[in-house]
């Protein structure tokens, strides 16, 4: 998804013929359905323990939401492992937007995340300290609507789903001064900001802002330097 097209038959090949465009799209999908013969990159990896300048000469200039990683957030270890497996196939996975849940998936197909506060905290640790750009879905800092159906279309009020209105939790006043730093909170938003996961996110934000390598860095899992299931530098 992040590579410049290298096959001339797919470059600037769309026409006003809708059927032909669909056929071309399906052909392109089928021809790239596996990682075999696909380009790989070391842009996201350290050279030993040293940063190296990424080579973007074959990049198409876009990045993606990291759906494979998201889909494996049944626990932090699974998500981390899946991300490491996929990273060579992105031009630079440090640009991937990483997330646990969304308006569609929690990350399962049925309900908002209900793995517990401790598991949520570990998931957030991965999002804010591993490669990628962390993204939070509204309400997750409170485990909002945990366990309820994500979306059932017209078959139930939104208030009973994962897409329920969250604004009530944000009523009041607060003055934000920096990432994870605020003063003068009052009303419902004060309680929201004091929730365990909200406090954890504030702390992770401050750590990430203080360490440039966590914001946009490279990593290594070489056993020369680290040892452990989720260990990296």
Residue ranges and their predicted role:
Residues 100-107:
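Active-site neighborhood of divalent metal-dependent phosphoester/pyrophosphate hydrolases
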Residues 98-99, 133:
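Catalytic-domain carbohydrate-binding cleft regions of carbohydrate-active enzymes
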Residues 102, 135-138:
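Glycine-rich, aromatic-lined ligand/substrate-binding cores of catalytic
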């Amino acid at each position: 998804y992040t590579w410049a097209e290298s096959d001339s038959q797919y470059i600037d090949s769309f026409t006003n013929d809708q059927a032909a465009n669909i056929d071309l799209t399906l052909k392109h999908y089928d021809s790239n359905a596996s990682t075999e013969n696909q380009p790989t990159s070391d842009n996201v990896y350290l050279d030993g323990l040293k940063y190296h300048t990424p080579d973007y000469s074959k990049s198409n200039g876009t990045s993606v939401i990291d759906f494979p990683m998201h889909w494996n957030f049944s626990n932090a270890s699974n998500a981390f492992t899946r991300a490491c497996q996929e990273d060579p196939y992105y031009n630079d996975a440090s640009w991937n937007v990483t997330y646990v849940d969304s308006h569609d998936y929690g990350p399962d197909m049925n309900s908002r995340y209900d793995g517990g506060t401790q598991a949520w905290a570990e998931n957030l640790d991965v999002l804010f300290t591993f490669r990628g750009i962390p993204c939070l879905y509204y309400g997750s800092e409170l485990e909002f609507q945990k366990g309820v159906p994500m979306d059932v279309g017209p078959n139930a009020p939104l208030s009973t789903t994962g897409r329920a209105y969250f604004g009530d939790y944000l009523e009041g006043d607060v003055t934000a001064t920096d990432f994870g730093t605020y003063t003068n909170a009052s009303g419902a938003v004060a309680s929201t900001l004091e929730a365990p996961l909200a406090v954890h996110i504030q702390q992770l934000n401050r750590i990430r802002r203080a360490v440039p390598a966590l914001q946009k860095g490279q990593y290594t899992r070489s056993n020369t330097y680290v040892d452990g299931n989720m260990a990296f530098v």
